[in-house]
């Protein structure tokens, strides 16, 4: 029985030793993974800004300090571009409306001309010349 106890004791100690070694390697790998993640976080912080820094990036200048020449030029170019786009839009709208009104007037003139022509044909008695040639000149 003693040899069985010795074998069981050695197997048990081997299992305990292997489990400790396995935990140790997983811990060491885990710390290496953590170190890699921390390194990637540092790289991300170097590349990307914090959200608060990004929102205040263009507002670093104090309210009373004068704008730089570049800022003034950029703002003026943006304003001019917006004005140009607005002008083009309203010009296009005006042209479309003018075309619409012109077509409506042309159609109305055509309808009234046809109505006058029909009235003249209906009331022409054949005895007198038509209205165009029956003008009284003084």
From Swiss-Prot:
It is found in: Secreted, Extracellular space, Extracellular matrix. Proteolytically cleaved by a furin-like convertase to generate a persistent C-terminal fragment found in almost the entire cartilage matrix, and affecting osteoblast differentiation. Sulfated on tyrosine residues. Residues 90-122 form a coiled coil. Its main location: secreted. Pfam families: UCMA. Keywords: Coiled coil, Extracellular matrix, Secreted, Signal, Sulfation. One of its GO terms (cellular component) is extracellular region. Predominantly expressed in resting chondrocytes. Residues 28-64 form a propeptide. Residues 1-26 form the signal peptide. GO terms for molecular function: BMP binding. GO terms for biological process: embryonic skeletal system development; negative regulation of osteoblast differentiation; negative regulation of SMAD protein signal transduction; osteoblast differentiation. PANTHER family: UNIQUE CARTILAGE MATRIX-ASSOCIATED PROTEIN (PTHR28647:SF2). May be involved in the negative control of osteogenic differentiation of osteochondrogenic precursor cells in peripheral zones of fetal cartilage and at the cartilage-bone interface. Belongs to the UCMA family. This is Unique cartilage matrix-associated protein. It comes from Homo sapiens (Human). The gene is UCMA.
